[in-house]
């Protein structure tokens, strides 16, 4: 078991970072619900300060609805939507943005206090500052994503959705890793673990699979090919190709779903190899073995949930649960990679 230097740790800082990570997890879940209910384009303006308040009068609601009526999603998809129907989708997007503002405040204000009190271990200060910058960037990316669906499209661009989710998950991983560092302090032992590279590679693979899932979501590809293990009776879909390489990889429903399936099978195989090798390795003890088992278990549960979600044609509840499962898998894979980075 690795021992740590107590002088280089801060439990209050760690607890704060874990809380922010939990809030980012909630953001990912609410974001999934916002997407699945087609609510993401209901607020057509970006007002970081004034936008924190919802419409406060019937006149304000009508004005907001009129703005929504000007975009293609209303004109081509929801021309019969009433004001009451608009309110339903508005609240999802508003809640998602409000939660984002709250996460920013819960991160920035304690950060300033901890810096003044010099409670943050010196080696983590720049990382904490970088995460503040990433949080601000995420807000800009969110609007960049929404803006792609306000003029020519009836939904946001899949690659922008992938960027938005990917940045959220990257911040989630970094928060967990930094919280673990703050909780435990610097390790006394600096020997390089043979598991470090493999664990980081697996974490990267899980992250990449999450990005592929975002492309599936952005293209509504979960609503086609709802059989398994084949795709409309074939292993390789006949309409895999799109308009060029990028059109295939980012915009073909058949391609993005096939890629997500194939990489899921690869992750399943990698998880089996991971847990078998971890169980046989005498140098990996205690938490390392337990976390390896947990990683494999969550991979299998997430894969089963993905198949269920697909075959059920993506009901909102299962779609949100599958997105939450991706974040849980990332969290467990992060904990495993962090724990085995040294003996």
Swiss-Prot record:
Biological process, per Gene Ontology: heme A biosynthetic process
Alphabetical UniProt keywords: Cell membrane, Heme biosynthesis, Iron, Membrane, Metal-binding, Oxidoreductase, Transmembrane, Transmembrane helix
Keyword Metal-binding attached: yes
Top-rank EC class of the record's enzyme: oxidoreductase
Pfam families according to UniProt: COX15-CtaA
UniProt pathway annotation: Porphyrin-containing compound metabolism; heme A biosynthesis; heme A from heme O: step 1/1
Cleavable signal peptide: none
Single GO MF annotation: oxidoreductase activity, acting on NAD(P)H, heme protein as acceptor
Intracellular or extracellular location(s): Cell membrane
GO CC field: plasma membrane
InterPro entries in alphabetical order: COX15/CtaA_fam, HemeA_Synthase_type2
Entry membrane topology: Multi-pass membrane protein
Binding site for heme: 260, 322
Family: Belongs to the COX15/CtaA family. Type 2 subfamily.
Name of the protein: Heme A synthase
Organism, as annotated: Caulobacter vibrioides (strain NA1000 / CB15N)
Lineage: Bacteria, Pseudomonadati, Pseudomonadota, Alphaproteobacteria, Caulobacterales
């Amino acid at each position: 078991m690795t021992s740590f230097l107590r002088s280089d740790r801060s439990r209050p800082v760690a607890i704060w970072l874990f809380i922010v990570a939990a809030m980012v997890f909630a953001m990912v879940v609410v974001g999934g619900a916002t997407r699945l209910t087609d609510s993401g384009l209901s607020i057509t303006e970006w007002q970081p300060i004034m936008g924190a308040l919802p419409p406060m009068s019937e006149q304000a609601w009508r004005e907001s609805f009129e703005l929504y009526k000007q975009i293609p999603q209303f004109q081509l998809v929801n021309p019969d939507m009433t004001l009451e129907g608009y309110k339903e989708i508005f609240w999802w997007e508003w809640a998602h943005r409000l939660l984002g503002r709250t996460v920013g405040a819960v991160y920035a204000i304690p950060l300033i206090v901890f810096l003044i009190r010099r409670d943050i271990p010196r080696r983590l200060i720049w990382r904490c500052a970088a995460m503040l910058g990433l949080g601000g960037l995420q807000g800009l990316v969110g609007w960049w994503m929404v803006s792609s669906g306000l003029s020519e499209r009836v939904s946001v661009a899949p690659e922008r959705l992938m960027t938005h989710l990917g940045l959220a998950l990257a911040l989630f991983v970094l928060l967990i890793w930094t919280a673990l560092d703050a909780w435990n302090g610097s390790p006394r032992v600096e020997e390089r673990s043979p598991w470090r590279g493999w664990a980081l590679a697996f974490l990267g693979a899980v992250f990449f699979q999450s990005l592929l899932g975002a492309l599936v979501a952005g293209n509504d590809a979960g609503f086609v090919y709802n059989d398994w293990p084949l795709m409309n009776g074939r292993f390789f879909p006949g309409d895999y190709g799109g308009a060029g390489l990028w059109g295939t990889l980012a915009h073909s429903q058949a391609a993005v779903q096939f890629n997500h399936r194939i990489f899921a099978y690869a992750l399943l195989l990698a998880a089996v190899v991971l847990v078998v090798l971890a169980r046989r390795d005498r140098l990996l003890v205690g938490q390392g073995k337990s976390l390896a088992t947990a990683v494999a278990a969550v991979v299998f549960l997430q894969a089963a949930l993905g198949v269920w979600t697909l075959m059920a044609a993506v009901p909102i509840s299962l779609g949100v649960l599958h997105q939450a499962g991706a974040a849980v898998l990332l969290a467990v894979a992060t904990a495993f990679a962090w724990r085995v980075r040294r003996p």
